[in-house]
Every structure is written in C-alpha cells, then in structure tokens.
Swiss-Prot record:
This is Probable U6 snRNA-associated Sm-like protein LSm4. Residues 2-75 form the Sm domain. Residues 80-91 have a biased composition (Basic and acidic residues). Binds specifically to the 3'-terminal U-tract of U6 snRNA.
C-alpha cells in the first residue's frame, strides 16, 4: 500500500497530522498532492506543549514538515480491500503488449518469417547486389541500369 494512495482514499475523512516541530493538526482532509502537501478543513491546531489550541476554517500543510499521519482504520481497510480486488481481477502480465523479441511465430494469420538475408528459406532475398537472375544474364538484379 502506497502512502499517496492511502491519502487519496482518505479525502473527506478526519485525520491527525503531527509536524516535525511538535504541533498537531486535527481536521478533515480535503486534498493532497504528489509532494504530500495536505489541505485540511475544520482544523484544530495544538501547540507543541499541548497548552494552546487554535480553531481554523482551513489549513495547508507542506509535505516535508510532516512527521506523522493518523488516518481512520476504515480508510486503511478500504485501501487494502481495493488492492486485493485489483490483484484478483487479472494476473500480472495479462493484457500487456509483448516486447519486440517476444513475437510468437504461431500467431494467427501470420506466416513464419525467414531466418535471414539471402538464405534459401522461402523468405525475401534481401537487398544485396544481384538478385536471383543476375548470374544468368537476364534483366533485374545488379545495381547498374544496364
């Protein structure tokens, strides 16, 4: 479970945020971004000593000042349930495109390819000098016009 997915799921729920300087903020999570910056509503801020309290309509907390986050257990359970259902839906690798080298010759509607240039394998003869009729003196083959 990733912290950002947990925070995205916790939107609208109450949470406690403790900062590195010791202050705590209790409020409802409105939003968070990829740097874990947090926007809270209906916030009660408690000083480091716990002797002063402030009520604020909303608050923005920078992500790199956060030491601790407490989210409700129901949010954690919901995220774990979503992760489990995601893994149950399809096994890893199903539905993904294969890499270039992983082509299967038995693919439906495809002819197997030759093994290389100029080989007598039924495939194309390549673009080298002289084609199949170059030595017999006929037209074609060769690089010149004549």
């Amino acid at each position: 479970m990733l912290p950002l997915s947990l925070l995205k799921t916790a939107q609208g729920h109450p949470m406690l945020v403790e900062l590195k300087n010791g202050e705590t903020y209790n409020g409802h999570l409105v939003n968070c971004d990829t740097w874990m910056n947090i926007h809270l509503r209906e916030v009660i801020c408690t000083s480091k000593d716990g002797d002063r309290f402030w009520r604020m309509p909303e608050c923005y907390v920078r992500g790199n000042t956060i030491k601790y986050l407490r989210v409700p257990d129901e949010v954690i359970d919901k995220v774990q349930e979503e992760a489990k259902s995601r893994t149950d839906r399809k096994p890893p690798g199903v539905g993904r495109a294969r890499a270039r080298g992983g082509r299967d010759d038995s693919a439906v509607g495809r002819q197997p390819k030759g093994i290389g240039r100029g080989m007598d394998d039924g495939g194309a003869k390549g673009r080298g000098k002289g084609g199949p009729s170059a030595k017999s003196g006929g037209r074609g083959g060769g690089r010149g016009r004549g």
